[in-house]
Amino acid sequence: MTIMRKSHPLMKIVNHAFIDLPTPPNISGWWNFGSLLGLCLILQILTGLFLAMHYTSDTLTAFSSVTHICRDVNYGWLIRHMHANGASLFFICLYIHIGRGIYYGSYLYTETWNIGILLLLLTMATAFVGYVLPWGQMFFWGATVITNLLSAIPYIGQDLVEWIWGGFSVDKATLTRFFAFHFILPFIIAALAMVHLLFLHETGSNNPLGIPSDCGKVPFHPYYTTKDFLGAIMLLMLFLTLVLFFPDKLGDPDNYMPANSLNTPPHIKPEWYFLFAYAILRSIPNKLGGVVALALSILVLALLPYLHTSKQRSLSFRPLSQTLFWMLVADLLLLTWIGGQPVEPPFIIIGQVASALYFLILLLLMPMAGLIENKLLKW
């Protein structure tokens, strides 16, 4: 008689994805972040669901409904801070996951990689529309500035912005539709994550050496379920420390003031996880040029499979490319810092140099380094 998990139609799917899945025996802790992203998504959907039960998407009551959640709802303060800081945690895991994909050459699984880029764009869209909902001062002005960027699109720009706003400014209609988008998008992300896994399991996982590991694969359970469980516990410890001891550390003080369209904050900026893209946007003095650079800062990732010149897949044995990779990481941290600074010297020139370096490393220096390393190894 066959074991139920191998014969039952539903159990069979779970079995092939999480139990009997053949996995490389040498994947490191950097491979934990895929499962951690799944955990973050579940956490965000659950906390978001409970917040939606008490939130009202109306400009007159949105701010006070969030206050009501924190003051009057049982553990409302905890749910709210878990949801707000859960977004930061989500993006930390997401950026590490993408960084690991670049370092170990996982982008050569083109279908999986492209679905991943789509997931990144959807997650950024979800975070942006969710950011507006509490209707604080920076939330309101952030929404106004970022949506207004679409007016740079020739011919249809202004109409497109007014269509998104539902009027001539960010108002009740905007808040209502942003709430609707924020509610539905995580479920689309969850469905796409399934497709992401489906494509990954077609090819099997990559490994730190970047070489085929078909001859020595091990079952996913119990080896990697245990490893993922350990990663989840460590992540939750970090998360709860942030939520319970420093809940407002990553937020903006301006958001404790209700939105006021007559009073502009001195320095408008998005959440920390968008600052690198915001710095690239600001580094170009032209509005349309800035919007194009902003879009390319994410879409450039889609070119990586076609810019791979090395005969080796991973960066594990390529010191020149490793140096460039860590330069890219340092550059992104620099851009994140610059995005939070006012638009004045010396921050302007630092942002412009860092933005140019970001594209230069990805589009030119890393492919060149791959060719040089091939030459050095006489390949």
From Swiss-Prot:
It holds the Pfam family Cytochrom_B_C. One of its GO terms (biological process) is mitochondrial electron transport, ubiquinol to cytochrome c. Belongs to the cytochrome b family. GO terms for molecular function: metal ion binding; ubiquinol-cytochrome-c reductase activity. Heme b b562 binds at H83, H182. A ubiquinone binds at H201. It is found in: Mitochondrion inner membrane. Keywords: Electron transport, Heme, Iron, Membrane, Metal-binding, Mitochondrion, Mitochondrion inner membrane, Respiratory chain, Transmembrane, Transmembrane helix, Transport, Ubiquinone. It is a multi-pass membrane protein. This is Cytochrome b. PROSITE patterns: CYTB_CTER, CYTB_NTER. Component of the ubiquinol-cytochrome c reductase complex (complex III or cytochrome b-c1 complex) that is part of the mitochondrial respiratory chain. The b-c1 complex mediates electron transfer from ubiquinol to cytochrome c. Contributes to the generation of a proton gradient across the mitochondrial membrane that is then used for ATP synthesis. Signal peptide: none annotated. The gene is MT-CYB. Its cofactor is heme b. Its main location: mitochondrion. Heme 1 (or BL or b562) is low-potential and absorbs at about 562 nm, and heme 2 (or BH or b566) is high-potential and absorbs at about 566 nm. The chain crosses the membrane at residues 33-53, 77-98, 113-133, 178-198, 226-246, 288-308, 320-340, 347-367. It comes from Geomys tropicalis. CDD domains: cytochrome_b_C, Cytochrome_b_N. The cytochrome bc1 complex contains 11 subunits: 3 respiratory subunits (MT-CYB, CYC1 and UQCRFS1), 2 core proteins (UQCRC1 and UQCRC2) and 6 low-molecular weight proteins (UQCRH/QCR6, UQCRB/QCR7, UQCRQ/QCR8, UQCR10/QCR9, UQCR11/QCR10 and a cleavage product of UQCRFS1). This cytochrome bc1 complex then forms a dimer. Heme b b566 binds at H97, H196. Binds 2 heme b groups non-covalently. GO terms for cellular component: mitochondrial inner membrane; respiratory chain complex III.
